[in-house]
A protein has these predicted regions:
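Bacterial Sec-dependent N-terminal signal peptides
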Residues: 1-32
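Residue-identity detector for glycine
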Residues: 5, 9, 48, 68, ...
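N-terminal prosegments of processed precursors
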Residues: 28-122
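Non-catalytic propeptide/linker segments at domain boundaries
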Residues: 114-165
């Protein structure tokens, strides 16, 4: 009787472990389909005042390993004042999304932003794509309306992407 229970218990544990590996593998395939285990650092400049805002790309760097999320890549758990969205080049499928809030957007709420123009550096980390992607950066107002956005293409083979680390 004890031996039968022990076998049942071992079978249950083995099945559970196998299911966990299968589920992990399914999520890993989504990451591995579009990305490699490297980080792409994109430096942006946000500039402007309360009347107009601008986003420009400053530089791109890549470093070893990706330490961010590998599952639910297009889900955003918490909404911020902006989002970075990654799609395969010329396609509509979102393969990575993350939200953020910036000091620039906070500064826009101060009186100084009514009569002065400033610029702020911002850095975003995304997994390194295998192929060319379109990266969209959107900034929202307090009503969740897009006030400024920038879409640019990143080719992972671009010689201007600096390798660091």
């Amino acid at each position: 009787m004890k031996e039968k229970r022990m076998r049942k218990w071992c079978c249950y544990i083995t099945t559970t472990i196998l299911l966990m590996f299968c589920i992990t593998n399914i999520y890993a395939q989504e990451f591995n389909k579009y990305f490699i285990d490297r980080t792409l650092r994109i430096d942006y400049i946000f500039s402007g005042n309360t009347k107009e805002q601008h986003i420009s790309v400053d530089k791109l760097n890549t470093s070893p390993r990706w330490y961010g999320k590998r599952q639910k890549l297009s889900n955003v758990p918490i909404e911020g004042n902006g989002q970075i969205i990654v799609k395969p080049h010329n396609k509509q499928e979102v393969i990575y999304r993350n939200s953020f809030s910036t000091l620039f957007q906070e500064w826009l709420s101060y009186d100084e932003a009514n009569y002065s123009t400033k610029s702020f550096e911002n850095v975003f980390l995304i997994p390194m794509p295998k192929d060319s992607v379109d990266v969209t950066l959107e900034l929202y107002n307090n009503r969740r309306e897009t006030v400024v956005s920038l879409t640019h293409t990143v080719n992972p083979n671009d010689i201007l992407i600096r390798h660091i680390g």
